């Protein structure tokens, strides 16, 4: 289980392999940092946008993880379990294209997680001399980490909500997002987003009070309390 402040916040965790980084507004864009492969399909795509002013090359690295988080254990995926195409993309400034992911793993009731790292590489190596006398790149390599969730092929979406105790539990075998907005007139920035994996439980005082509380599953909003008029927020 992990939490994100602000229900519409999609802050990228960027690893810049250079001390002289370009503005983040002029870098790779991949949309939501968590994306899912639905239980009824074996294919999902991810759009990559080159927001730079010059061409870039994009590559992918994939690791299987036991569970997303700071203490996750990364391993090499089983050969043939998760494939992607193409091997790399070359995009001019402003262009976009899709990487496609194909799942050929077990068709059971277990959810699987993968760390997908998108690597943005300049097509030319421009350097600038640093104050110490060395050279640094003026167009850095950028790595953006995302999480691909392969939902169980035998999926069970189940949850429970106890307003008395302020508790939401994931009693199924696949993840969903919980949006908690205190009060009926609170803004998106005042809310919280919780990502619940199977077995996760969230205890929050706000869940005992009136507010706009939703589950988001497969891009669908599910209102879990009737204390406020229905007004679905953004799923980002």
Swiss-Prot record:
Gene3D superfamilies registered for this protein in UniProt: Immunoglobulins
InterPro entries (alphabetical): Ig-like_fold, PapD-like_sf
Induction of its expression: Negatively regulated by H-NS. Positively regulated by IHF and EcpR.
Membrane spanning residue stretches: none
Record key words, sorted: Chaperone, Fimbrium biogenesis, Signal
Signal peptide from the UniProt entry: 1-27
Name of the molecule in the record: Probable fimbrial chaperone EcpE
Entry's family note: Belongs to the EcpB/EcpE family.
Annotated function: Part of the ecpRABCDE operon, which encodes the E.coli common pilus (ECP). ECP is found in both commensal and pathogenic strains and plays a dual role in early-stage biofilm development and host cell recognition.
Domain of life: Bacteria
Keyword GTP-binding tagged: no
Phenotype of the disrupted gene, per the record: Mutants do not express ECP and are defective in biofilm formation.
